């Protein structure tokens, strides 16, 4: 059995972005950094179950029905595959999360809420940040 030990906050502060720390056929894990207040991803879901644990900062999870949940350090969210959500840094410091998801990273889909399409290939180098440009891009990609 192989065991690796990681200093997640050190990785987060040195890399400053989403960094995979583990990837097998059964599970993958990563550290996710949202540096600025207001940084958020798109409303989306994945095709696998997952968890997020807040290590630093404040994370607000938004849901399609307008609901939300605020998580602080040490709090964990479990998300069933197919459940739509959006993560946002609503704190005053960088938001650092550790996430893990069942299955290998390459098998995971990132389904956008508006288009209902897998958009994983649009952001290979880190999480998709919601900007006016990305909003316009997805408005144009809506299915007929």
Over which residues does each language-model region extend?
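Short acidic-glycine-tyrosine-enriched beta hairpin
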Residues: 65-81
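Short, conserved beta-strand element in jelly-roll/cupin
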Residues: 33-35, 45-61, 100-102
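A short beta-loop-beta micro-motif enriched in histidine and acidic residues
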Residues: 22-27, 37-53, 65
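Ligand-binding loop in jelly-roll beta-barrel domains
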Residues: 73, 81-108
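A short, N-terminal "cap"/entry segment at the start of jelly-roll beta-barrel domains
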Residues: 1-31, 40-42, 112-144
């Amino acid at each position: 059995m192989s065991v690796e030990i990681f200093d997640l906050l050190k990785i987060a502060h040195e890399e400053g972005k989403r960094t995979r720390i583990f990837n097998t056929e059964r599970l993958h894990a990563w550290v996710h950094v949202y540096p600025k207040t207001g940084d958020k991803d798109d409303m989306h879901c994945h095709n696998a179950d997952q968890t997020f644990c807040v290590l630093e900062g404040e994370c607000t999870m938004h849901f399609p029905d307008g609901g939300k949940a605020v998580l602080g350090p040490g709090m964990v969210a479990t998300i069933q595959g197919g459940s739509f959500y959006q993560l946002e840094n609503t704190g005053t410091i960088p938001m650092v999360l550790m996430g893990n998801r069942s299955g290998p990273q390459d098998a995971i889909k990132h389904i956008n809420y508006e288009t209902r399409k897998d958009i994983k290939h649009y952001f290979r180098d880190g999480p998709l940040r919601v900007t006016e440009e990305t909003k316009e891009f997805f408005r144009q990609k809506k299915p007929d």
